[in-house]
Amino acid sequence: MNVLSLFDGISCARVALDRANLKVDIYYASEIDKYAVAISKKNYPDITQLGDITKLRFEINQDKDSNLYSENMVGVGKFDIDLLIGGSPCQDLSIAKKNREGLHGKRSSLFYEFVRLRDELKPRFFILENVNSMSKENKQIITDVLGVEPIMINAALVSAQQRKRLFWIGRLVNDKYETVKINLPDDKGILLKDILEENVDEKYYI
């Protein structure tokens, strides 16, 4: 499976795919934070780092004489994506920010870069994640633009953290995206005391 992870951070999506026993052939990552990229490179040296999402360009080269064409990501070469994943910045969407600008904000408007690349690359599947606490208006805009319905999953079902997030999951069918419906995970009942370690190496302290 070929994966493109946008707003990749420290490549937690790669960790999740590995834990799900999904074979990853090629993993491309778009991330601009140098510290996050450094961690990703240390843990997964095989990941291809593409840099700033706003500078990623996809093009089709067509040979008019032979009707052959090739799909390329500028600077990378042939590009065939099975899964596009990403969680666009939420600072302008979350209720944690008082004067939030919604999808017009400088950071949260990067959602439209996700959409641009999805429409250019036509991946077989895509997953977009964002905060559940956004306004109904912004939630509906994202839903309408992506063309699929979201599902809300609380990380508390599988971890010791209350973290409600929306996931829009789409599958390409006849050149259009359809909603992929999934079941909520079972509640594992994990508490903070279940994951805290008593003896931790000092190198992990700041």
Language-model-detected regions and their locations in the chain:
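A structural micro-motif
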Residues: M1, V24-D25, D46-I47, P123-R124, ...
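Exposed boundary/loop context
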Residues: N2-L4, F79-D80
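SAM cofactor-binding core of SAM-dependent methyltransferases
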Residues: V3-R57
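Class I S-adenosyl-L-methionine
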Residues: E59-L83, S88-I206
